[in-house]
Regions:
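Pyridoxal 5′-phosphate
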Residues: 1-237
């Protein structure tokens, strides 16, 4: 079989990934929830993964790396942290439903930076014209349908100059193109683990440039006495 559906999920995973997953299932359990050997082993794996991700995406504070169930989970956290009913949100014309549906469900006022298809200069002009009226910008790095690469570093710079928070959907670019947290200055960067990072299904990353609001509440494995989630990252999320 010749597999061409890598934009949805990469397959077959590298042998090293399969070995690491098998090893973790046999030796590790309950990271951050105990002092026994399996818990400490699991915690070490999580910390090492967080440090590796922070190095790959140029995040100087590893605690800003929050692990999620997938990119949809990460995007929902990011969007619901910064948008609400009536928020003026600017998006590209290439967004995934994981961006547009949460915004629609919230009742955000969505505007599209539209241009001729695959017109880099036209897209930049559309964003330049519309960012001043926006309260939030959400943009994909690469279209999952067309493979078109959007000029997100330039868009992020426009947002920074205008004081508008920027969320990047790096679902199709993480592991393929450079995703530089410090250069982007994004409020949030979301990505899955199961695409070009060659991880398993059910994994994702949210890089938190600002404080977010937890989408789910429950056991954090630390600071368990308060009724609310801890205030510090990554446990807060």
């Amino acid at each position: 079989m010749i597999y061409l559906d890598n934009a949805a999920t990469t397959m077959i995973k590298p042998e090293a990934v399969a070995r690491a997953m098998t090893d973790a299932m046999r030796r590790a359990a309950s990271p951050g929830r105990g002092g026994h050997v399996p818990a400490m082993t699991a915690a070490e794996i999580v910390y090492r993964c967080r440090e590796n991700a922070s190095e790959l995406f140029n995040v100087p504070e590893p605690e800003r790396i929050v692990f999620t169930m997938n990119a949809t989970h990460a995007l929902n956290i990011a969007i619901r942290s910064l948008a609400h009913k009536g928020t003026r949100v600017l998006v590209s014309g290439y967004e995934h439903n994981s961006v547009t549906r949460p915004l629609a469900q919230l009742g955000a006022d969505i505007a599209v930076a539209s241009s001729a298809p695959f017109d880099r200069n036209g897209i930049l002009k559309a964003f330049r014209d519309k960012i001043p009226a926006a309260e939030l910008v959400v943009c994909t790095h690469v279209s999952n349908v067309f493979g078109f690469i959007l000029p997100v570093y330039e868009i992020a710079d426009m947002c920074r100059r205008a004081g508008v928070p920027f969320i990047l959907d790096a679902s199709q670019s993480a592991g393929v193109l450079e995703v530089d947290y410090q250069a982007l200055g994004a409020a949030f960067i979301a990505m899955p683990g199961h695409k070009a990072l060659f991880g398993p299904q059910g994994t994702g990353i949210l890089i938190c440039g600002v404080e977010g609001e937890p989408l789910l509440s429950g056991g954090s494995g630390s600071d368990s006495i308060p009724q609310l989630m801890p205030e510090y990252l990554p446990d807060r999320m």
